[in-house]
């Protein structure tokens, strides 16, 4: 760039030194000089103090200054263009440093850690079983500070690692241009198909239905970073039958993408609202119609959400945005906890403390300490779980929808906080008995250390399920075992594809 600047300035100076010669050799310069000769010469100075003989010299000086200014402007534009080009190239290649294979030093450091890695839930399910598994994430080459060793992954995202083996070739991904599956503050989710050649028959191409999360604006660097951080969180979380499974990610393209399993029935909140008319308290059997919705289904959903959240405790990961809109449901009634977009530490405090009740932010699901002090812990997730129980057993009602006062719409979060600090809580939903409502109230204790635990909730709803329909519980156990195998096949999908490429 410096060479370009020197050349332009040198060229400009050289041209101005010969400017007089060029003008004299042209018809324009001859006309110009003839006009100058017709001007009466005088040795007297005019009012400005300049002699007439200096007029031509002044003109050349002005022209010289003009051309120098233009040359500097052109150089500045070239410098800006090249700088912007380098910045965009750097943005596209962001994340390359994370695509590294595990080293022996990493394994050594990991094995010496006191962190207990989560294991997949063994089935059949019992209340005393562990949800620990070996997660695929590890710390990056930047050493994690000792004080963060036992901290939730939310607090050390910059030290999390993204593995190369989950990278997807964007050319193998077809993204639907139709109606999106969902959208949020920073990202949009679309249906897609991931192509892969069968490792046994390279001529046969198979396609996997997937959900693809992209930034709303691919040119927004902040949104790109949020998608990339969520991708690393999902890598760290690993696989569990009640957690949305990561298929892979795209980090080399112009935009970052998260590719996850496709869940056909959408979010649980919409499912409950759409199926209210089919709700029945009749005894469930294996012959029960697929479209029906019964109390035992609600108990199953509550049980599964608690199982998924208990698993996150052992990762460890704080979800921060647990709500039925972020819980997906498959056709076989198995749920997946999704949307880890808020699992990262958000830098903008106003994102949570919104002044508008019309903004779809999780104020109604947040614990008082989260609203007031932005303190998010596993205990604040327990509070959110209690609100999920209200949504479940009210068949999708919005929490606090009847307590909003028009004159309290400004600084709404302050009103919600005051409402909770006064000891007021959500009412008992129509389809929750006294025992279930008591569990909900245990989730909403102002003292976070006095709240119930997910393990207690698992034990409670397991007992309720077995009492209501042991046949349903045994069928659920078989389904969860099958889902564990299905998620393992998702991992093998990319392995087969890379095997074919090699």
UniProtKB/Swiss-Prot annotation:
Entry GO MF terms: ATP binding; transmembrane receptor protein tyrosine kinase activity
Subcellular location: Cell membrane
Annotated TM spans: 59-79
Catalytic activity annotation: L-tyrosyl-[protein] + ATP = O-phospho-L-tyrosyl-[protein] + ADP + H(+)
GO cellular component: plasma membrane; receptor complex
Induction description: By UV irradiation, high temperatures, starvation and old age.
Bilayer disposition of the protein: Single-pass type I membrane protein
Active-site residue numbers: 321
Major site of localization recorded for this protein: membrane
Gene Ontology terms describing biological process: cell surface receptor protein tyrosine kinase signaling pathway
Domain Protein kinase, first and last residues per copy: 175-473
Leader sequence residues: 1-19
The keyword Disulfide bond appears for this protein: no
Domain of life: Eukaryota
Cytoplasmic side stretches: 80-502
Extracellular side: 20-58
Disruption of the gene: reported phenotype: Increased life span and resistance to UV irradiation and high temperatures.
Enzyme Commission code: 2.7.10.1
Keyword vocabulary terms for this entry: ATP-binding, Cell membrane, Kinase, Membrane, Nucleotide-binding, Signal, Stress response, Transferase, Transmembrane, Transmembrane helix, Tyrosine-protein kinase
UniProt feature, compositional bias: Polar residues: 127-140
CDD domains according to UniProt: PTKc
Renumbered residue ranges of the record's region Disordered: 99-140
Function: Receptor tyrosine kinase which plays a role in promoting longevity and resistance to stresses including UV irradiation and high temperatures, probably downstream of daf-16.
Family: Belongs to the protein kinase superfamily. Tyr protein kinase family.
Matches recorded under PANTHER family: PROTEIN KINASE DOMAIN-CONTAINING PROTEIN-RELATED, TYROSINE-PROTEIN KINASE RECEPTOR
Protein name: Tyrosine-protein kinase receptor old-1
Species this chain originates from: Caenorhabditis elegans
Name of the gene this protein is made from: old-1
């Amino acid at each position: 760039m410096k060479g370009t600047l020197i050349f332009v300035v040198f060229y400009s100076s050289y041209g101005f030194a010969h400017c007089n010669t060029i003008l004299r050799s042209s018809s324009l310069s001859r006309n110009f000089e003839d006009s100058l000769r017709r001007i009466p010469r005088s040795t007297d100075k005019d009012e400005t103090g300049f002699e007439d003989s200096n007029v031509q010299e002044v003109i050349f000086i002005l022209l010289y200054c003009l051309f120098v200014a233009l040359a500097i402007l052109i150089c500045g534009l070239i410098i800006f263009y090249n700088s912007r080009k380098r910045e965009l190239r750097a943005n596209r290649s962001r994340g390359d440093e994370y695509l590294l294979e595990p080293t022996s030093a990493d394994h050594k450091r990991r094995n010496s850690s006191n962190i207990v890695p989560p294991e997949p839930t063994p089935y059949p399910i019992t209340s005393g079983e562990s949800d620990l598994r070996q997660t695929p994430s590890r710390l990056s080459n930047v050493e994690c500070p000792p004080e963060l060793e036992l901290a939730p992954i939310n607090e050390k995202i910059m030290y999390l690692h993204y593995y190369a083996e989950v990278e997807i070739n964007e050319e193998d991904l077809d993204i639907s241009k139709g109606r999106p599956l969902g959208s949020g503050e920073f990202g949009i989710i679309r249906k897609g198909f991931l192509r892969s050649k069968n490792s046994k028959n390279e001529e046969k191409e198979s396609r996997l239905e997937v959900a693809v999360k992209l930034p709303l604006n691919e040119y927004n660097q902040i949104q790109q970073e949020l998608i990339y951080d969520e991708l690393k969180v999902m890598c760290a979380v690993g696989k569990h039958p009640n957690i949305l499974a990561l298929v892979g990610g795209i980090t080399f393209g112009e935009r970052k993408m998260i590719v996850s399993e496709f869940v056909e029935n959408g979010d649980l909140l919409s499912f409950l609202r759409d199926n209210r008319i089919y709700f029945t308290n009749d005894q469930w059997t294996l012959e029960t119609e697929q479209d029906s919705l019964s109390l035992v289904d609600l108990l199953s959903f509550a049980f599964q959400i608690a199982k998924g959240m208990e698993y996150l405790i052992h990762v460890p990961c704080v979800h921060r945005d647990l709500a039925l809109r972020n819980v997906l449901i498959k056709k076989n009634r198995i749920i997946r906890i999704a949307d880890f977009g808020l699992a990262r530490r958000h830098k903008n405090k106003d994102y949570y403390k919104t002044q508008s009740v019309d903004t779809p932010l999780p104020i109604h699901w947040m614990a008082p300490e989260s609203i007031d002090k932005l303190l998010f812990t596993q205990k604040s997730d327990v509070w959110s779980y209690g609100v999920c129980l209200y949504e479940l057993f009210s068949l999708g009602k919005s929490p606090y929808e009847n307590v909003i006062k028009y004159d309290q719409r400004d600084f709404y979060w302050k009103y919600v906080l005051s409402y909770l600090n006064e000891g007021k809580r959500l009412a008992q939903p129509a389809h929750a008995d006294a025992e279930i409502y008591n569990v909900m109230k245990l989730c909403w204790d102002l003292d976070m250390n006095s709240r119930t635990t997910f393990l207690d909730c698992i034990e409670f709803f397991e007992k309720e399920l077995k009492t209501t329909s042991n046949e349903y519980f045994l069928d659920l156990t078989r389904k969860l075992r099958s889902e564990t195998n299905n998620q393992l096949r998702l991992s093998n999908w990319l392995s087969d594809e890379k095997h074919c490429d090699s």
